[in-house]
Design a protein with these regions (language model features):
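Terminal helices and disordered tails flanking the catalytic cores of nucleotide-processing hydrolases
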Residues: 1-5, 22-23, 27-28, 65, ...
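Active-site/binding-pocket entry motifs
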Residues: 13, 54, 109-111
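Short regulatory/linker helices and ligand/cofactor-binding micro-motifs at input modules
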Residues: 4-19, 29-36
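Regulatory and interdomain segments flanking nucleotide-handling catalytic cores
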Residues: 55-60, 141
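Active-site alpha-helix of zinc metalloproteases
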Residues: 43-47, 127-128
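Short hydrophobic alpha-helical segments used for membrane anchoring or interfacial signaling
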Residues: 46-50, 103
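Catalytic glutamate of the conserved HExxH
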Residues: 52, 56, 133
Length: 246
């Protein structure tokens, strides 16, 4: 688990947008795997991280275009087409992660065309697909309930038992956390960014969905200490667990 965390952290500095996606997808996929009682659920966790790892190789000038799926040049599309193979090559060099590669390979295969086996690979792939697509649509600004309804209706593309678990998780999340707008100085460990955190000049520090941990808090404080006035927006939207509410 420590090695996987280190891989995820490598994205936080180099590609904060994709690190934010890793955190969101990883969190969602792990919760879905728990509800579905997936065998060897650690594979879902690892696959969530590796699903975004190849984006480390993206040139900085096209990172946001790729992340937001804007119009891309033929050259960039060609580069992206090689990412699945690049990821498999990395996985092939790590003993014991063969099934993680199988999960990633099956994500874009409709679940009904692959038989579910005892190894749980098909179910794990279905979970990762739901987590990835839910995250994409939420990033586009769609309401969570609409996303869930849409995925549930597309029962030939998404495993119904996984989308039902997704629906259950969204209800629980709404009951156990709340959206608040707070001063940047009040941000604290355990909160989660609900919007991108950028400097006043537009430089991205952390993506929406990033968990506020000691490292991010340190980065914010370091920036504040280097400027006469804080370079961050005066207020920021965060998700606050109910147990942190004062």
């Amino acid at each position: 688990r420590g090695a996987v965390d280190a891989l995820a952290e490598s994205l936080s500095t180099a590609k904060p947008l994709f690190f934010g996606r890793v955190q969101r997808v990883r969190r969602m996929a792990n919760e879905l795997a728990m509800k579905q009682d997936v065998p060897n659920a650690w594979r879902v966790d690892v696959a969530s991280v590796f699903s975004q790892l190849a984006y480390l190789a993206l040139p900085e000038n096209v990172t946001e275009d790729v992340y937001y799926r804007r119009d891309l040049s033929k050259e960039v599309k060609s580069l992206l087409a090689k990412f699945p193979e690049d990821t498999r090559n990395i996985l092939n060099k790590i003993p014991g992660l063969e099934e993680v590669g199988e999960i990633l390979k099956s994500v874009d295969v409709q679940y009904r065309f692959e038989e579910e086996k005892e190894d749980g690979v098909r179910l794990a792939a279905s979970i990762l697909k739901v987590a990835l697509d839910f995250d994409y649509y939420e990033e586009q600004g769609y309401n969570r309930s609409i996303i869930v309804s849409t995925l549930k209706e597309r029962n030939k593309d998404y495993d119904p038992k996984v989308t039902q678990s997704l629906s259950d998780l969204i209800v629980i999340a709404e009951e156990t956390s709340t959206l608040q707008e707070i001063k940047i100085d009040d941000i604290d460990i355990g909160m989660r960014l609900s919007q991108e955190l950028r400097l006043d000049d537009g430089f991205l520090i952390a993506a929406a969905g990033t968990d506020v941990d000691r490292q991010l808090l340190k980065v914010i404080r370091n920036y504040n200490s280097c400027y006469a006035e804080s370079p961050f927006p005066k207020r920021v939207q965060v998700i606050v667990p109910v147990n942190l509410l004062k």
